Every structure is written in structure tokens, then in C-alpha cells.
Amino acid sequence: MRTPQLSLLVAAILVASASTATSAYSQQTAPVPNVRSFVQVIRLKPDMVNEWIEIQRNEVIPAQKKAGITSRTTLTTQVGNAFEYSIITPFPKWEAFDSDAPLVKALGRDGAAQVNAKLRKCIMTQYSYMTNRVDSLTIPAPDALVWRIAVRRAVPGKMNDYLAYYRAEVLPGLRKAKASGQIAGSTIAIRGVGAPSGEFTTVTYYANFAGIDGGDPLVQALGREAADRINAKSAEFSTATQVFVRRRIADLSF
């Protein structure tokens, strides 16, 4: 989920500025990312997974709710790095870092230190980054079990074009796939501080893993010829770097 100080600024400039490219999409106004989240990606020690889950369930989540965290999504990687978990929480303003962390607000400094000490014993590696979801390009599916995540990198100067292409070409097909029950939803999010510049994700949500067996939702919704034409255009604006599948953990989310 990676120079961090500049990446959010670069992503914002790429989205907000008009592209100088001559593609058919260059004159369209791309939507601005408007929901920012803080993502933690945690690799656990294999023998400490169950303990970490119990600490999250019994200590961390109650403290987060007490501190006023409004939502949290916890994912485990089904296909990708083993023993890897992701926690996504809202991050509306940077001023959040000027005050106490949620655990400190809820438990006090001593209580938070005790919980963090327990968590550190479970963790092998951990990193974090910001992500900016584009709401106008999102088909919501907040409780979807399965997330198929494609990490992509925009061709320099082409982020604006990619978002316009996605809105004009991809989103209508995904809406049709949603209406027919082939997918639960979808979203696109631009990664910011903590991630490489120009990196973004497209996420397809499914109610279960069997949904992935249907293949490309654009093929299902529009037919092979139309889907191939649409997919071929994406190479003008971005390259795919990684695809993996994650599962939402309901009792570690709220």
C-alpha cells in the first residue's frame, strides 16, 4: 500500500489540473478525490495472529469507538502476502496528528502504552499511507466480503485523463454489472502520502469469492468485443503493477 512528503501534493495537482494531452478525454473535467482515509498495512508474526485479533477485538476497537472514530474496515489478504492485514479509518484533516492518538484519548497514556506494547509483540512489519477515494466514481458496497484490488500507476501527466476515461468508459459497464448482480460495487482511489507518486487502485467488490469466477465484469456486462476495446484504452493512461484479493473481517470492522 510508498517521496511521501510530495506524493499527496503531486496526486492532487494531477487530478485538479487540466491535462495537456491530445487524447479524446483531455478536455473532460476529472472528478476530484474527496474522501481521504488512513491505511495501515500490518504483517503479523505467524504464531501471533490469533493474539493480535483478540487485542483488536477486545481492546483496540472499543477504544477507537470511545475516541470517536466513526468507521473502520479491516481486511486480510487472501491472495498476496501471507499473514497481512489492512486497517482503513477516516482521515479528514491533518490536524488529527496535533492531538492525542485515539488510544490515548480513550485509555490514557498508560493504558494506550500497555495496549501498544501488546500489539508490537505481534507485528513483523507495518507501514501506512493515505488514500483518496473518488466518490463520484464509486459504486458503494460498504459491507462487501471480497475486494479484488488492482494497483495501477498513472503515466506521467495522465492521471486526469485516466479518471475521465474511467468515468466515460468503465463506470457505465460496472454499473450494468452491479445491476445484474455480477459485482457488489466498485471504487477508484488515489494513493497519497506514504505511497509512490501516481499510484492508485481500482477495487471491485464481490459478495463472495465465487463472484470472481465470472471473470472481467465488463465482459459479462458488455460482451467481449466492447470490453476488449475499453480495456485496451487503459494502457494509454496507466500500467498495472499488482493485483491481489482481500477479505473483509466483519467483527473487526464497524
Question: Which ranges hold each PLM region?
Answer:
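Short S/T/G/P-rich N-terminal loop/turn motif that feeds into the first structured element of a domain
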Residues: 22-254
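Bacterial N-terminal signal peptides that target proteins for export
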Residues: 1-10
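Bacterial N-terminal signal peptides
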Residues: 9-19
